[in-house]
Design a protein with these regions (language model features):
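Catalytic-core region of carbohydrate-active enzymes that cleave or remodel glycosidic bonds
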Residues: 184, 225-294
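Aromatic-lined carbohydrate-recognition surfaces of secreted/lumenal glycan-active proteins
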Residues: 104-108, 154-163, 171-195, 244-252, ...
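Bacterial N-terminal signal peptides
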Residues: 6-18
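Boundary/entry segment of secreted carbohydrate-active catalytic domains
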Residues: 24-50
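Substrate-binding cleft and catalytic face of glycoside hydrolase catalytic domains
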Residues: 54-70, 85-163, 257-259, 301-306
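The substrate-binding groove and active-site-proximal loops of carbohydrate-active enzymes
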Residues: 30-35, 71-85, 123-133, 156-165, ...
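Aromatic-rich peripheral "rim/lid" segments of glycoside hydrolase catalytic domains that contact
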Residues: 264-267, 279-281, 288, 292-336
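Aromatic- and acid-rich polysaccharide-binding/catalytic face
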Residues: 138-157, 189-229, 246, 250-258
Length: 336
């Protein structure tokens, strides 16, 4: 669908979106919990709620070796407490007791550091193993999510090549997940995949992992970062209108580094640490998106439920805990 520049600007400004009042009333202000190794209590949920978050995202991981393409997960043992049914169920109960909502987001890791977005098996045997085992993995957690009252289920994370190569499989998988979960669905598209994901019509939200490169320089100002966001925001507004779905940032985050806006997906432990650069990047994000009616909300990548803030603050990774970025999140989530 062709949109004129004038209409695109109107969409970016939030004009004429039919779900505006509904989206404004239900903004998702969430955090992605890094699955805790050991059992955690209500204080972990309370800490997140203290910054104004109203959702958490739980991520039970699976693992695959490219040699055989089989997706492996171990819900009966062998994974972290926060990835197993007992841990997931406990965290859902604690969140619900505090009036919060939960997204369940199965997340696949590949061996040798390979990116899931470009991986496809290299044989018919590999494809069969990949498809069958991924379906078992996703359906297991869809059924679990339904049973424990999860509010939103994510069917996949950054799997562009798989989706593009096997659209019939994914349509059938969505049918099965819909039957098992019986609730709203999304898919977490990588930032460079979101415009071409073919199945948004079957999702309730356009999900995007929002690691868009927005400024190549070190320590940019908030104003410079806002300029870097403009084209991406226009494209997301256009997509939202065409697909008639709100946009949810299923992951959104910046490392605590001077160049965090240049390659936001990249984590470099040797990069210069800069809390203020991380905080400015977050502030620019909210300045651009928070008042757009097609913006459904975001999940902050990421939050360590089992670490004290002082420990989580160390290094230069994504966590906002104990850093200047946490103050930005608190201000924006609480509307202060």
């Amino acid at each position: 669908m062709y949109l004129t520049t004038r209409l695109a600007i109107a969409l970016f400004m939030g004009v004429g979106i039919c779900w505006s009042s509904r989206a404004e009333a239900q903004k998702i202000e969430g955090v992605c919990f890094s699955a805790p190794r050991n059992e955690v209590g209500d204080s972990s949920i309370a800490q997140v709620q203290s910054i104004g978050a109203n959702w958490i995202c739980l991520m039970p991981y699976a693992f695959a070796r490219t040699e055989d393409a089989k997706v492996r997960f171990h819900p009966d043992g062998g994974q972290y407490w926060g990835e197993m049914p007992a841990g997931i169920s406990a965290m859902v109960r604690m969140a619900k007791a505090r009036g919060m909502k939960v997204m369940l987001k199965p997340h696949l890791w590949l061996g040798h550091g390979e990116f899931t977005g470009t991986y496809v098996p290299d044989s018919a045997i590999g494809w069969k193993a990949y498809e069958q085992s991924y379906q078992e993995y996703v359906l297991y957690y869809a059924k679990l999510g339904h049973g424990i009252g999860v509010d939103l289920f994510c069917i996949g994370t950054e799997m562009q090549a798989f989706v593009q190569a096997r659209p019939i499989y994914w349509n059938k998988l969505i049918d099965k997940v819909s039957d098992a979960f019986q609730g709203p669905l999304t898919y977490a598209a990588n930032w460079d995949e979101v415009a071409n994901f073919p199945l948004w019509d079957r999702m309730n939200y356009i999900g995007v992992d929002g690691y868009f490169p927005i400024c190549a320089k070190d320590r940019p100002t908030v104003a410079e970062l806002e300029v870097g966001w403009q084209q991406h925001a226009l494209e997301l507004a256009r997509l939202s209108t065409v697909k008639e779905r709100p946009v949810l940032f299923t992951e959104m985050g910046y490392c605590c580094t001077a160049d965090c806006a240049a390659r936001p997906w990249s984590e470099d432990p040797e990069a210069p640490r800069d809390e203020n650069a991380q905080a400015r990047a977050w502030q620019a994000f909210f300045n651009v998106y928070a008042d757009k009616p097609w913006y459904a909300g975001c999940f902050v990548w990421k939050w360590f439920a089992d670490l004290p803030q002082d420990e989580a603050r160390r290094g230069n990774g994504f966590s906002p805990q104990g850093r200047a970025a946490m103050n930005v999140l608190r201000k924006e989530f609480k509307g202060q």
